[in-house]
Amino acid sequence: MKFRTLAVALGISAAALLAIPGSGATASLQTGTERMQTGPNQVANRYLKQQLVWKQCGDPEYRTFCAKITAPRDWSNQYSGNDIELAVSKVTPVGKSKTKPSRVIFGNPGGPGGAGLGMAPYLASQAALAKDHLFIGFDPRGTGDSANVTCEGAPGFTMDARDRDSSNLDLISEAALLTRPYCERQSRGLLPFVNTAQTVQDIDLIRQLLGYDKIDWVGYSGGTWLGAYYQTYFPAHVGRFVLDSNTDFTKPWSDTFLAQPQAFERRFREDFAPWAAKHDDKLGLGGSPRLVIRTYERLRRELKKQPAVEEFLDGSVKISYDQNALDDIIAGDMYTKADFQSLAIDLAFLRDLSAAQTKGGPKAAQRKVDALPLARQHELVRRATRSTVGLRPLGRPFADDAEDATFTAVTCNDTPWPQGREYGDQLAARLGPKYPLLGWGMNENPCFYWDRPALEMPVPTGKGLPTTLMVQSVHDPATSLSLATSAHHRYAGSRLLTITGEGDHGVYGGVNKCADKIINTFLTTGVAPAKDLSCKGEGIPAPSVPDSEDDGAGAPLRRIAGFTKEVSGYLQ
């Protein structure tokens, strides 16, 4: 993204959105009358005396061991008897099984709500770090193998966000309004305590149980928010922190999400569409960016008029492709250029599937699916059921309910949001015409109706901290460059490493050799760049023939998700 503040990028700011010009609409900013304690709490001895029992999780090749720790449900009320369990993973450097590594590095993949046990083997796979770090991953409270929250049964957003009919807007509003009651009723009292203030204290408990004075950190996406707040709550225990693909952690969550419609639209129109047009001879979506976008819009209209509901794998899986599914597929594939080829192939398939259905009816479309090789059917099922990696857009659910519920709890609990339906509808009406991929769905947000806990967290400033290294690609769709530059200017002592000509969300670990070298130097030596730096992007690769299933190479967050899948479920 060109260097522009959020106010310029969207023509609007979080403060200005409280009164949208020309609409007559106003929205109150949500506040609490009684405040939860905002600083860290002294830890009760019973939590510090617990012994961690490590067991191997996953195949031996991952060298990963996992344990459960006990933490209070509410850190400001440690003697209530209401405890929760948290899942932690570790990988010890080769040759250090009997000696304590000199440093410990924690990782978080973001979400917020992403399970993170896979961060330990992922970080251990970075050769530059492998000598003398203990690698730690964890599932934050609410998700993964830790104590879960759930919103199961909540209606969700199945409507077409572009439909501005009053009855459709009623349905969107009612779905958003009903989300919290479902979450609260089924989460057994945990929901208000799934927030960043509680989670950073969980992290520091892990630090103390491991016996380290300071931690290093690699946080992606929502993990930049969590990392900055850990620094704010526990500055004396901060080591070398890398914040990759940045939220604006110096402002409320709303600022970060308000930047997404433009950033996703830019990634789609300025990165994917020109790339697809350049390779039209192989992909067949149109010979110009305008024609590629036209292919998408035409397909969206057809799938709205007549969704394609197909059976895969001999009827064992049924997938419904409608306009929302199409938008979700596109948004999900904007996070990494490694998914561009799969997206192009899927768009061509859906175009042909829809055409077959229009011409010959549902049976003709099903015959087209049945003719696909089993490997291709498996790939379509995998892509249809995957979770978003990185900071997801509003209204787009994770495949996993606990991740989805944790995302909602953290983003709605942490910081105030403007309240009320009128605000959300006016926001969507303003952003939708400019940024149709996501803008119309900006009213699909439970936070506009959320009864927050009385929580007020200190604003991260960076003052008194060691250097923080912030890393950002310029066309990141989920966390816009505008957010990184805004936070960087407000975060004392930070350095910003920008990757130009790049749009991947999540950089460290294979996206850019220049960036990896700078980050590894910082993490292994503590030597930070003396000034802000930039690296040149390595470009979007041409389509390969034939398309091979993506193994996550060059896409760090996909690799982390793969590791997490392999090492989870062993602590039940």
Language model segments and positions:
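A catalytic-pocket lid/entrance helix-loop region that shapes and gates access to the active site
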Residues: C151-A161, Y229-T295, I330-G332, Q341, ...
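Catalytic-loop region of hydrolases
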Residues: F3-G11, I20-N168, V218, R290-R294, ...
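Alpha/beta-hydrolase fold nucleophile elbow
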Residues: Y212-G222
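Alpha/beta-hydrolase fold active-site neighborhood
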Residues: T26, R294-L465, P541, A555-Q572
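Short beta-strand/loop motif that positions the catalytic acidic residue
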Residues: G464, L469-Q472
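Conserved alpha/beta-hydrolase "acid-adjacent" motif
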Residues: P477-S482
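Conserved acidic catalytic loop of the alpha/beta-hydrolase fold
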Residues: Y182-G189, V200-K214
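Histidine-bearing beta->alpha loop at or near hydrolase active sites
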Residues: T500-V507
